[in-house]
Regions:
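N-terminal accessory beta-strand-rich subdomains and adjacent acidic, glycine-rich linkers
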Residues: 1-124
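Proline-rich intrinsically disordered, low-complexity coils
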Residues: 17, 39, 98, 102, ...
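Residues at structural and domain junctions
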Residues: 82, 128, 143-146
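Long, charged amphipathic helices and adjacent flexible linkers at domain junctions
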Residues: 121-135
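Aromatic-lined carbohydrate-binding/catalytic grooves of carbohydrate-active enzymes
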Residues: 133-181
Length: 181
C-alpha cells in the first residue's frame, strides 16, 4: 500500500499486491515530495481494514526526491530499500558538507490502517514536533481562497476580515492567485 494523488485528492490509498517482483515508488521531480507520491509504504496480507489486521509500515523522513523499492523473493521474503533517489541526485561530500542518510521509520500494528495512522500521529507529536511548540496554541488563519476562490474584491475582503475577527482569526491571508485577479 502506498499513498498518492493530486491536488484536492491527496493521500489516496493505493493497494498493490507484492508478488515475486519489485515495486518502485519514487519522486524525481526536482522538488519536494508531494501529493503525487509520499515516501511511505505499508504492507499487509491483503485483508487489513481501517480497524483490523496486521500492518507493517515505513516512512522515509525526507522531503526531497526519494525512491522506495519493495521486493519479494521466491521464498516469500519481503525487502524494503528506501532512501534518496539516485536518478538525479549528486552530492559532493566534503568535511564541511557531510551527508547523513535520512531515517526510515518502521512500525507495526494489529489495528489496521487506522491504528497505523494513530501510531504515526502520536510518534510525530511526541518525537518530531519541537516540544517547546507542542502545546503552544497556534494562530487561527483565515484564507480568502476557500470562501471566494477567484471572486476577490474589496467588498468580499472587508466581509472576510469581519468574519475572521468574529471567529478569532489573527492573520487573514489573500493568496497569490487572488492578488493576480
Amino acid at each position: 500500500t502506498h499513498y498518492a494523488g493530486a491536488w484536492g485528492a491527496e493521500y489516496t490509498r493505493n493497494r498493490v499486491p507484492v508478488q515475486q517482483n519489485q515495486i518502485v515508488l519514487e519522486n524525481h521531480r526536482l522538488t519536494c515530495c508531494a501529493a503525487q507520491h509520499t515516501p511511505f509504504v505499508a504492507l499487509d496480507s491483503g485483508s487489513a481494514t481501517e480497524e483490523t489486521g496486521e500492518v507493517f509500515y515505513g516512512a522515509l523522513c525526507w522531503s526531497g526526491d526519494f525512491k522506495i523499492i519493495v521486493e519479494r523473493n521466491f521464498g516469500g521474503e519481503v525487502r524494503i530499500n528506501a532512501g534518496v533517489n539516485d536518478y538525479d541526485t549528486r552530492w559532493v561530500l566534503t568535511a564541511e558538507h557531510p551527508f547523513e542518510s535520512p531515517e526510515f521509520v518502521l512500525g507495526y500494528t494489529a489495528d489496521g490502517f487506522g491504528g497505523m495512522s494513530k501510531t504515526l500521529f502520536d510518534w510525530q507529536f511526541d518525537y518530531l514536533l519541537p516540544q517547546n511548540k507542542a502545546l503552544t496554541p497556534r494562530p487561527v488563519i483565515y484564507n480568502s481562497w476557500y470562501p471566494y476562490e477567484f471572486d476577490v474584491n474589496e467588498e468580499n475582503c472587508i466581509a472576510m476580515a469581519q468574519k475572521a475577527a468574529r471567529i478569532g482569526a489573527e492573520p487573514v491571508v489573500t493568496t497569490a492567485t487572488d492578488v493576480n485577479q
